[in-house]
Regions:
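Compositionally biased, non-globular sequence tracts
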Residues: 1-75
């Protein structure tokens, strides 16, 4: 198995978050449109949080540290 490049992994998640924001809205209306937008928002949040994480490998375990405090309260 190839070595895990944690920094590259985080970059890919940041790129995925950006791609979700640029994703065009398909030609749907009503409930389908609402569901698509809701899913896109959830996808963005998930990818962005992982992309912003501090990652370490500890004894073979990938640890992602995600600071959920407001930006003005981070250390």
């Amino acid at each position: 198995m190839a070595a895990l490049d944690v920094d590259a992994l985080l970059v890919r998640f940041r790129e995925r978050a950006a791609a979700v924001r640029k994703r065009p809205l398909p030609p749907v209306a009503g409930e389908e449109r609402r569901a698509f937008i809701e899913q896109a928002n959830q996808d963005f949040m998930d990818f962005a949080m992982v992309g912003d994480a501090q990652a370490t490998l500890e004894d073979g375990v990938l640890v992602l540290r995600i600071d959920l405090r407001p930006a003005d309260q981070r250390g």
